[in-house]
Amino acid sequence: MEKKGADLFVLTSLDDIAWLLNIRGGDIHCCPVVLSYLVMTKTEIRLFANEKAFQTDVLEALEKDGVTLFPYDSIYEYVKTFKKDKKVLLCKKKVNSRLVSNIPADTRILDEENLTLLPKATKNPVEVENERIAHIRDGVAVTKFIYWLKKNVGRIPITELSAVSYTHLRAHETLSDL
């Protein structure tokens, strides 16, 4: 935020909020996110979400981390309070028009990618090692499948289902099984 010269950072993409705060939810079927908005300044983090979306221990952890929870829809009134001398960093591609239109016209908007984009994409050493192991395991499984297929084609009946079953068996083997 400081490098960009911003006073406030508005984050609206649900996966980025979940990643940044390390929270999961069930507001959207089959997607572990919480319907929310986040506004960060140099001194505070405001999370706009339904309090019922969180268990007590999560609320306590957020509070301990300095995150203040506000009602989900109150974001629209809050952004109206942005001062004209403030610079607001947000990604217009990921912000709804109602939110942008509620920001005072004399507030300077810095339209840039979310600050979470690069850190989210950066793998730590454990993630890199686990990815390497997964690639090796998958490569061995595919090699075994191709060998099995070449060896057995024409010798035994092979259907799509039996081929998929074989690949699933190989894919679930651990490296020590291989």
Language model segments and positions:
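Conserved small/polar residues in nucleotide/adenosyl-binding loops
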Residues: T167-T174
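A composition/biophysics-driven feature that prefers long, compositionally simple stretches
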Residues: M1-Y166
